[in-house]
């Protein structure tokens, strides 16, 4: 068993070099599913190793979700598969997680790619609107977090997140 802690602001992608761990080119951090499991089964990541966080509160929430997933993994020796991809669409810099199961509620974290006022954030699945939220503004320096209910999702079809 191993626990690696990386304390700092910028994602430490060099930890993944040579490990076979998939890295997201947009965040320069680990590629994770809704369980915060990386591309290597049983290896989990949260916090700034995924993407830069502006508030430690979000890091703490990710760590709690990761701990729950890691405990489930240790108990069952596996987690439900996450075949659905989550993609950053128009005006979105990146999204976390990059893969989901479609059968569990999860929190979507994202940053917009440019400052915007009076925005509409939309999550679609195969062109069908899953969530729409209006915001007075969105800034690249401020992470947005959105709870996504599994009941709103289909069991197949990738998701795209966009901001207009």
Q: For the regions a protein language model found, what residue spans apply to each?
A:
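FAD-site-proximal beta/loop scaffold in flavoenzymes
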Residues: 2-53
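A conserved FAD-binding loop/helix module that cradles the flavin
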Residues: 46-90, 95
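Extended hydrophobic-aromatic, low-complexity segments
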Residues: 53-58, 119, 131-133
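Solvent-exposed, conformationally flexible loop/turn segments
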Residues: 103-105, 138-143
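Aromatic/hydrophobic beta-strand junction motif of beta-rich domains
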Residues: 106-115
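Short, aromatic- and glycine-rich surface loops/edge beta-strands on solvent-exposed regions
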Residues: 108, 121-123, 148-164
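Beta-strand-rich binding/interaction modules
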Residues: 117-127
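Solvent-exposed serine/threonine-rich low-complexity stretches and specific carbohydrate-binding patches
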Residues: 128-141
């Amino acid at each position: 068993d191993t626990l690696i802690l990386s304390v700092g602001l910028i994602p430490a992608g060099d930890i993944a070099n040579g490990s076979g761990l998939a890295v997201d080119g947009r965040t320069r951090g680990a590629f994770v599913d809704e369980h915060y499991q990386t591309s290597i089964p049983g290896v989990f990541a949260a916090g700034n190793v995924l993407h830069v966080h502006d508030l430690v509160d979000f890091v703490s929430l990710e760590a709690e979700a990761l701990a729950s997933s890691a405990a489930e993994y240790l108990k069952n020796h596996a987690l439900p598969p996450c075949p659905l991809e989550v993609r950053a669409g128009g005006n979105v810099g990146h999204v976390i997680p990059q893969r989901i199961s479609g059968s569990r509620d999860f929190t979507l974290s994202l940053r917009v790619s440019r400052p915007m006022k009076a925005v509409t954030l939309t999550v679609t699945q195969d062109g069908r609107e899953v969530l729409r939220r209006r915001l007075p503004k969105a800034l690249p320096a401020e992470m947005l977090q959105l709870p996504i209910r599994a009941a709103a999702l289909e069991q197949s079809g990738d998701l795209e997140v966009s901001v207009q």
